[in-house]
Structure formats: C-alpha cells, structure tokens
Amino acid sequence: MGKYDFITRPNRLKQFTYKWQSSENNPDLLQLWVADMDFLPVPEIKQAIIDYGQKHIFGYNYFKDSLYQAVIDWEKNEHGYEIKKGEISFIDGVVPAISVAIQAFTEKGDAVLINSPVYYPFARTIRLNDRKLVENSLQIKNGHFEIDFDQLEKDIVENQVKLYVFCSPHNPGGRVWSSDELQKIGEICLKYGVILISDEIHQDLALFGHKHYSFNTVDDSFKDFAIILASATKTFNIAGTKNSFAIIQNPEIGRASCRERV
C-alpha cells in the first residue's frame, strides 16, 4: 500500500460532488454521511479511464471476457467464492439491481423485508415499487447489532414475506455477519421459500481481523434462492463509475431477472 497516496486531501468543493455540495458556503462542515472517500484515485484506475477515453468512441459496448474473469478471480482469491461466467450479470448499480429483483420476484402489495436500521435506499426502493415494507429491527447487544432470529421468522410468517433484502457487511452498523448468523438466515429463508438479495458491496472492507463470508459460500443450498450483489465502487472509491454485478447461481432466477431487465 506504500505506493498509494492517502495523505493528500483534494479540494472537492468545486467538483460537483454529491458529498460536498452543501459545504460550499461552510467549508468547515464535515461530511460524514456517505461512503465516498476523499483520497486521490488509484493511479492505475485513473490511467485506464484516460486511455479508454483517448482510444474509444463512447457507443454501446459488450462486456469482454476479461471483465468476467476479473470478477471470477477476485471472488475466488479474496472471498473463496467460486463462480462461473454465466452466473454473472452486470448492472449500473446495486440499488437498480434491487429494484429489478423486486419487480421480477414480487407483485404489487407483496411483502419485502429489511433489517432496520439499514441503508436508506432499501426502504425507498421497496416503497417506490408499491410493495409492503416489513422492518425487522436489529438489536443492540454487546456494543453491536444482532439479529433476533425468532422475531425474524415471526415477521416472515405473519407478513408472508416474498423477498428479503439483506446487507452484508451491514451498512451503517459495520457488522460483519458470522457464518453461523448467515446459516440461520438461510435456513429460515429456505423453510419459507423466501428469495434473498445479499448486498455485499462492502465485502472488501472487513477490518480488524473480521472475515466476510459471501452468503452463498456458507451452504450450497443457499445458491438456489439467493442473489449476491457486489461492486468495485466502495473498494476502490469509484462510485461515480456506476458499476456493479449480480451473482445468480439458480438458472431459473437468472432467467426471471433477465426478463425483467429486458
């Protein structure tokens, strides 16, 4: 990491940045509300964007095999998650992917569950799609968030939940869920036929010895009902590039997602 600059603080007040737009008249106001870091871009990424701009026309493109392979290699090397090219779908962002899944696997009025508090676009996206929002409240124990699994099961049964939008690692609480916790979630979803979306956009930022487990690595049976969402945007601080990917290992779920996107 020594070759990267984590010291220089760029002035972003005049760069039309969403994070700092409210600070133009108050430069001493600290903006800590969004996952957008004030580090200089990684030189290799910056140069790749410059090279592309100099060599290419900005028309419709297809996804090269090397891009799929980069995702395959990253997931295997960083998280022990083995996937195939045909299981990867690229999309503009995690939130648009959640919206696609809501439309593909639920009908208007169906119940969609989240663990609150959680990243606020989850609830907004569910409501904008005219679905019933079910909030399973996280409990604060031992200084961090925990899931009340009895209440989770009760919420799913009483509301006939069809879809569960899960955040792993958790935003904003920072919880890196254990494999045992993920196992319990998966067993409940399997028991009641709930499709789970696991937003793992912060998967590479597990710190202080904590290990992130991609949901589908915990139990092979989870691949039948879970959609994994991830992106390079948080890891490399490139949210403005609008890129993410979904990993769908159940072909039937994959086809339904594709139909909704078309």
Language-model features: where?
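Walker B catalytic acidic pair
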Residues: 200
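Conserved core segment of the aminotransferase class I/II
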Residues: 47-48, 219-220, 224-261
